Amino acid sequence: MLLRFASFLLLIVLGLANPALAQSRLDVGAMGSSIDLAPYLQQLTTEKPEVMVELPRDATGKVGVIALKSSRSVPSYHWRILTLVNTGKIPKNLIVVIDHQKFAGSRLLYPLNPGSVVASIAHTGSVAPARISALGQDAYSLVLEPSANLSLGLEMTGTAPSALLWERDAFDSLSRSIAFFRGAILGVAVLLSV
């Protein structure tokens, strides 16, 4: 019991003492159905609408650069940068999901506006991530070939409640389940109102 507690405290201390984790690359080759992106998102705040950001080194030791260009005019720009790499042998069909700001998760005084928190998206590579329809979320579909890298820069209008990376099949299955549940609730509500 004491050994478990000591190892738990050691994990907490090591987790707090490693600020470089946010600038690491996320390997999606052996990923499960979903993963929380919070530890892998590099945060950048700047007053310039256009900025070049250095990315983490790839497997060959090269350092890449991503160009971030804002789509709006504000006093300061908030970006979240994510680098994905596929070390697996098969292409990965992935969905990056950022929850919308909801009124319930807002502040008491001067509440935040509900809705999308992603103003624009920048990427490396030739194929832009496609925006897909998702209820209460900003979702972007991308395919990562074997041995490929992809970096995304998300311009944020506020703090994202959560950000997840999903495999496409798992995301579609969850979306269908939620749609069925919402339909069942709506059907019961209609029957009760009659």
How should each PLM-predicted stretch be described?
Residues A6-A17:
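Bacterial N-terminal signal peptides
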Residues S175-V194:
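Core alpha-helical transmembrane segments of integral membrane proteins
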Residues N18-A22:
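Sec/Tat signal peptide C-region and signal peptidase I cleavage site
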Residues M1-F5:
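Positively charged n-region of N-terminal signal peptides that target proteins for export
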Residues L11, N149, G183-I185:
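Small-residue packing motifs within transmembrane alpha-helices
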Residues Q23-I178:
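Soluble non-transmembrane domains of integral membrane proteins
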